[in-house]
């Protein structure tokens, strides 16, 4: 009977450890995805902030060549 209790406790302990590891990996994956989304948004903002100067440069180039 004691052998069964020890085996059961061992199985439960190993199950909890593996569950904890899986949750940690899931959390890290979600953080990486959030970081990637934030990077994409910041790149988009940088591009959009440069857009007016690019347009004005293109307009002045057309005026010079036109």
Swiss-Prot record:
Biased segments, Acidic residues type: 30-41
Domain of life: Eukaryota
The UniProt record lists the keyword Signal: yes
Signal sequence annotation: 1-22
Region entry Disordered, spans: 25-44
GO cellular component, one term: extracellular region
Record field: transmembrane: none
Protein name as it appears in the record: Phylloseptin-H7
Entry comment describing in which tissues the protein is expressed: Expressed by the skin glands.
Subcellular location: Secreted
Entry function: Has antimicrobial activity.
Propeptide boundaries: 23-44
S-S pairs: none
Any one biological process term the GO annotation gives: defense response
Family named by the database record: Belongs to the frog skin active peptide (FSAP) family. Phylloseptin subfamily.
Alphabetical UniProt keywords: Amidation, Amphibian defense peptide, Antimicrobial, Cleavage on pair of basic residues, Secreted, Signal
One Pfam family named in its UniProt record: FSAP_sig_propep
Modified residues (Leucine amide): 65
């Amino acid at each position: 009977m004691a052998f069964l209790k020890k085996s059961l406790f061992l199985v439960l302990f190993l199950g909890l450890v593996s569950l904890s590891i899986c949750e940690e990996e899931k959390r890290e994956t979600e953080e990486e995805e959030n970081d990637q989304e934030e990077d994409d948004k910041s790149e988009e903002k940088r591009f959009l902030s440069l857009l007016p100067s690019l347009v004005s440069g293109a307009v002045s180039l057309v005026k010079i060549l036109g």
